[in-house]
């Protein structure tokens, strides 16, 4: 049985290009033959590479690989063991942050299109934060649409870090602003106020907004 302390899960991706493989070596083993390639069922042959129970490849190129092992004893060469491993050392590319059309620049929630590319292991997740807030994990949906939480008016910065399935990452940012609602204006008001009379005010404010009045006695 072949194991790998550096690439233990045959279905996972790793950003380590120096895989290590171990196997048990019984006392009667007289020869070991190993090979790594891109085929799942390669026969490494019948020429012994020596007698050893571990091997460390160096600077293996990115991609999906298979490690092949064959052992020999006095009875000849045994069956071939195959072990798959995946390497991806290149970060994602083409991180694009696009501010979606905004009909209302004062709206506290802002939508972005967030996309990235990874040709080897594939994009896994995004870590997104606004300004200096804690980041949240976001998984891309079908339309690549990310919507912020409700934000206060003013300038903001969208910070995005995209990870591939091997843990490599690429960061990007985009500045945007939320416009403040214009303050309501009082156009006319009575110069004298009596406690037993209705107060009538005239003013201007955006449609469908709630205006709260506070009266303060000097």
Describe the role of every protein-language-model region.
Residues 1-217:
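Low-complexity, disordered linker/stalk regions enriched in Pro/Thr/Ser/Gly
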């Amino acid at each position: 049985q072949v194991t790998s302390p550096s690439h233990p899960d045959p279905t996972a991706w790793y950003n380590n290009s120096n895989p290590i493989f171990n196997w048990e070596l019984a006392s009667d083993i007289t020869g070991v033959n190993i090979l790594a390639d891109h085929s799942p069922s390669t026969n490494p042959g019948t020429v012994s590479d020596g007698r050893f129970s571990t091997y460390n490849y160096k600077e293996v190129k990115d991609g999906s690989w298979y490690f092949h092992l064959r052992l020999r004893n006095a009875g000849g060469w045994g069956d071939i063991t195959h072990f798959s491993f995946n390497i991806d050392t290149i970060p994602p590319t083409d991180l694009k942050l696009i501010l979606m059309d905004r009909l209302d620049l004062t709206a506290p929630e802002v939508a972005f299109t967030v996309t990235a590319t990874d040709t080897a292991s594939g994009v896994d997740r995004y870590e997104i934060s606004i300004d200096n807030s804690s980041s949240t994990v976001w998984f891309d949906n079908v339309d690549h649409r990310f919507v912020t939480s409700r934000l206060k008016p003013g300038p903001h910065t969208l910070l995005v870090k995209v990870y591939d399935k091997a843990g490599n990452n690429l960061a990007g940012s985009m500045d945007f602003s939320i416009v403040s609602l214009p303050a309501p204006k009082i156009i006319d008001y009575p110069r004298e106020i009596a406690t037993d009379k209705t107060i009538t005010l005239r003013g201007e404010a955006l449609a469908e907004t709630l205006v709260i009045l506070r009266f303060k006695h000097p």
